[in-house]
């Protein structure tokens, strides 16, 4: 299973409408891109509590979703090319229903592993001047996901993202997102128990599963 890389992207911290800084405005990179343990070399994160770090080194958002958001966006200018959602990796043909937690991919020469789905936040709505967008992303499960970098390397647009290992084929990013973010945590306690001990899942989400079990 392989997917052509449409774009690799990085950004610098800039102020949003509320004055808070964010590097959500990613720009496509040309040529070979260096990927380290903390993501693309030169990419920035303003909020390093909720973004970045080893477990959120790279954000992948499917370009397939752009057509859906063009339907309701007040201004579609930013939706004509990848980068509107702060993603570092853009592809087509792979989404939250077909990627699984723990999947390992070759991204160029780097090896990356899916660590969690992304939790939408107000900054995506702010960037597109669409306050309801984060809520819609949760409702529809169009969240994107994060990778941790297992082996640093380099990649460029036009390379392939190649699936190398899938240890948890039943645990799609969408299924885990719906349980831990989308409000379905009361429907399957056995699933929560499994997620609470799933070592490849981001520790913060394992803790969330435990909290739901204890609640």
List each language-model region with its residue ranges.
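A short pocket-lining beta-strand/turn micro-motif at the edge of beta-sheets
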Residues: 31, 143-145, 157-159
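A mid-sequence, solvent-exposed acidic-amphipathic segment
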Residues: 131-151
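Electropositive, beta-rich accessory/interaction domains or terminal extensions
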Residues: 1-126, 132, 168-215
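Loop/turn positions that initiate beta-strands
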Residues: 102, 152, 157-158
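Short hydrophobic beta/alpha edge segments that flank linear recognition/processing sites
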Residues: 161-164
